[in-house]
Amino acid sequence: MEIPQRTDVVIVGAGLSGLACARLLQAEGIDLVVLDSSDAVGGRMRSDQVEGFILDRGFQVLLTAYEELNRSANLNALDLQRFKPGSLIWTGKRLERLGDPFRNPTALPTSILARVGTIEDKLRVALLRQRLLSRPAQMAFDGPDRTTEDELRQEGFSEAFIDQFFRPFLGGVFLERDLKTSASLFRYYFRCFAAGDAAVPAFGIQRLPEQIAEPLGALVKVNTAVRSISNEAVT
C-alpha cells in the first residue's frame, strides 16, 4: 500500500507515543498515516535476536501500574516476566537486601536487619507507600513543587538512606543522581512501583509496540524518512 497523497493526520515516528496517538485517532475514524525511518516500529523500544537470544536495546522494563499502558496494550498477551519487588544494595562492604514485605511477607526479617538506613527510614518508606496508594495516581502531581531531594528530606529520611537507597534507585529512573527531578514525578513513579510489578515481555520489549501497531496495519510505513514539514505537506 502506497503512502496516501492526502490524509487528515500524518504522525512522524512509530514509537509508543506515535502509535498510541494513531490508535486513538483510528478509533475516532480519522484518516491517518504513521511514518518512520527505521525498519520496524518501536522507536527506543527495540529488540534483536542474536544467536538464539533476544536482546533488548538498552535498559528496558515495564511498570504494570502505568494507566496508559493498561489502556493501550493487552498485558496478558505479552507473557510478562515479572521481577520480585525489592533491591540489592552494595554498601561498600557487602550486599544488603531490601524487599517489599507488603507483597512478600517473608522479606520482612531480611529488610529490617539490612544495614541500610535506620528502622525509622524503613517505617517512613512504608508510610509513604501506604499514603500514595490510598490516593488516585493523578494526585501524585498535586503536592508541593520542589525537587525530589528536598521531598525526601521533608519526609524525614536520613542522608545515609537517601545516598544508599534513593540516589542509585531513582538515578536509574530519572537518569540523574542529584535528584533535582520534580517531586511530583517521584511520587508518581514510587506509587507505580508500589502498585504494580516491574516486568519485561517474554519475547522482548519490542513486542509491546508491535502489539499496539497491529490494528493499524498498513497505516504504518517504516523505512520512510520525513525530510520536511510545512503547513500544507509532509515530504
Model-derived features: where do they sit?
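N-terminal glycine-rich dinucleotide-binding loop that anchors FAD/FMN and/or NAD(P) in oxidoreductases
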Residues: 47-72
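Conserved beta-strand segments of alpha/beta enzyme cores
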Residues: 31, 54, 79, 219-221
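Catalytic P-loop NTPase motifs of RecA-like helicase/translocase cores
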Residues: 19, 41-42, 229
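Mobile amphipathic helical/loop "lid" adjacent to a hydrophobic cofactor/ligand pocket
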Residues: 66-70, 74, 79-179, 194-195, ...
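Glycine-rich FAD pyrophosphate-binding loop
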Residues: 26-50
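N-terminal Rossmann-like FAD-binding beta1-loop-alpha1 element of flavoenzymes
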Residues: 4-34
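Helical element adjacent to the flavin cofactor pocket in flavoenzyme catalytic cores
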Residues: 185-233
